[in-house]
């Protein structure tokens, strides 16, 4: 699979949110079995939903974190903690999102989420997160 086989708008948004390194790894690992799924998520999740004008990316990241904490999907949560930093959320805001979600998703889900967030934040030196220099309003244009 190559970039040219994926939805261009979805691929652009996916790269902006997750970073080139992550997206390149995902594309490189694509097999004939997973190719339809890569096409689907790039078109539907990134090209349609994440590109909509109704919410900025910072808000979408907050919602995504809460959903992933609830679902207890640690691999996806790790990826989206990084995306949340890239989209301008602070470590303190990420902590508050997990704490707030604990009320509705349960303490075990939040406990696992805090462990994932702590690991990601320890891997990211302070001030080097993409959003550290000031979050840019990245609302998608129509």
PLM features per residue range, with description:
Residues 33, 69, 87, 100-107:
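A short structural micro-motif
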């Amino acid at each position: 699979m190559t970039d040219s086989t994926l939805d261009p708008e979805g691929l652009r948004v996916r790269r902006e949110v997750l970073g080139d390194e992550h997206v390149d790894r995902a594309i490189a690992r694509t097999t004939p079995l997973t190719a339809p799924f890569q096409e689907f998520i790039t078109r539907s999740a990134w090209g349609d939903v994440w590109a909509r004008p109704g919410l900025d990316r910072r808000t979408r990241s907050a919602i995504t974190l809460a959903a992933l904490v609830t679902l207890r999907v640690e691999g996806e949560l790790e990826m989206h903690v990084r995306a949340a930093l890239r989209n301008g959320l602070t470590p303190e805001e990420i902590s508050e999102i997990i704490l707030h979600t604990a009320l509705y998703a349960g303490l075990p889900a939040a406990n696992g989420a805090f462990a994932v967030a702590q690991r990601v934040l320890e891997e990211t030196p302070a001030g080097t997160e993409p959003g550290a220099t000031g979050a840019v309003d990245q609302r998608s244009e129509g």
